Amino acid sequence: MYIDALDIYYVRHSMIEPWTTAYGSDPDIYSVMVKMTSGSETAWSESTPLLAPTYSPESAFGTYYTVKEFLAPLVLHKDFSSAQEILQAMSVIKGNPFAHAAIEIAWWTMQSKLTKTPLHTMLGGSDDEVEVGADFGRQDSIDILLKRIDGAIADGFKRIKLKAMPGWDLEMLKAVRSTFPKHTFHIDCNSGYTLEDLPLFKEIDKLGLAMIEQPLFHADVIDHAKLQQQLDTPICLDESLSSPYMAEKAIELGACKYMNIKPGRCGGLYNSWKINELARQAGIGCWIGGMLESSVGAGICLELAAMPNMTYPNDLFPSSKYYTQEISKEPVVFSSPAKMKPSNACGNAFVPEEDRLAQRIIQHTHLE
């Protein structure tokens, strides 16, 4: 598949309310969108690091700059027959998985379009419905959180993820568990703790959570392995899994019992598929996470969630949860309570509407 042109967009999506985690609060979501042109066809990708390098070392503008200045020249006016080829062409640029993903995912959606093959089929998945969960960041009070959890359970969500951070952890969790003693919960710590917090995790270990997601340093697998050895509750790695290499090391060390896969953080769809395969072979279950993408990126994550070995409800959400207006004509919606269905479209299931994209553009680069 020959790449004739690339349009790279740095965009801002306004949220209904800020999203608060251990690393801060985000009132808007910033992302990089790439429109790839091959012949008369176009295909899209979205990669969504946050505004600041708080979740990972990448920022949204830094990703935009890396794509347009360094990665795009490596792939423009060239022909690639596989994802491995395009990743190899970009491999001279170290790290920066969100930037690599912006290009690589566009290759996948274009290949899906040109070969008339749904993306989930290319990734070895099916079009069966996938189960999704509910997530809650830090709330203004525990009472507000409990009311929201009650509503999510009534809506049919079988598992609920709670953001945890110093000052919003054990007391909150005890209140949740005493109110909902049998429901499935897990916490996402976003690297907010260290091994010195072992006494806290020993207390959390008594609460019967499904997992503790990324409790320690964002690039670590060694300390996570030490922590996992001392807890019955499974650890799930998120930020640490920036590549298949890191997944291999996590498996070797016994650093986790679950893996969260995000295509931006992993460097694209091939790496996401590879990490899932490594996990499957090791008997480790996976699930798909999100970065609060618009429908363009969320639709791609939904296709990933159709892969085998997705053993836990995914972090996929309807557009109405976060955005007053979606960038595409059609929003992301549930296919049935707490479930979503992959698209049988070839290429992108969701593409930006020109006027809605124009309202969100901060910077745009066209290369041909």
Task: Specify the residue positions occupied by each region the protein language model found.
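Shared catalytic-loop signature of beta/alpha-barrel
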Residues: A219-C236, L241-K339
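Generic structural signal for well-ordered alpha-helices
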Residues: I149, L170-R177, L198-K202, V221-A225, ...
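Catalytic beta/alpha-barrel core
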Residues: K158-P166, T184-G192, L209-H218, P234-S242, ...
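Short, well-ordered coil/turn segments that N-cap beta-strands
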Residues: P97, D128-V132, G156-K158, P181-H183, ...
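Histidine/acidic residue-rich metal-binding segments in metalloenzymes
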Residues: R177-T179, K202-K206, A225-Q230, E252
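N-terminal capping/lid subdomain adjacent to the active-site entrance of alpha/beta enzymes
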Residues: M1-F185, S191-L195, E203-K206, E326-E368
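Active-site donor-binding loop signature of nucleotide-sugar glycosyltransferases
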Residues: S47, Q214, L316
